Amino acid sequence: MLCKNICAMSTYSESFERRVEDTLCGATVREQAAEEERLMKKPPTGDPAHDVLGYEKRSLDAIFRATSVAVIGATDEASSVGRTVMRNLINNPFGGTVYPVNPNRPSVSGIKAYPSVSELPEPVDLAVVVTPAPTVPGIMRECAEAGVQGAIVISAGFKEAGEEGVDLERQVLEEARRGRIRVVGPNCLGVMSPKSGLNATFAGAMAKPGNVGFLSQSGALCTAI
């Protein structure tokens, strides 16, 4: 599923996630998501008051409830998107694990970097992609092979850049569908979940936790609000 040019900020709730899917995905993807939920639902334990194992995993959990994130294109270069995204993830109260992925650097922000997603020490829930547009289809294929379930493609240079970009975006969508990866982007600000401390954006500040979920087609408007 490809959600084009979306910035999302949420305190995260199941009802919000369902509204996101209803708004962005369309009937075909909703049907696919319903089937995924049916397959992933664990049998109840028999005690509704303590039915922890009865939780239904939803297809957007990999984004809004991510516990591990790979930043593909993370770097220490000043004023770069890769540096800002990395800093936003590690400087906010996100309780998960963050892995920088960059084949040209041994470490980023003092954290060991890995050459590729396939070489990470564990599968990750979410990949945040900030590499040049021509590299993204291959990265999406690699993410699918590594079992990544959610991706945020911040990279620009797709449909908005002309015919070549249209073809690149089509390739990204094909790889995402093949790997059953939920995608926000490309050419987007990213996703914030203030309640969980996840700031997978290049925005200058983290939103405060609250009771409102916010989606914007415009990254500038999202940042301003």
Named regions from a protein language model:
Residues K4, E21, Q32-E36:
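Charged/polar low-complexity intrinsically disordered segments
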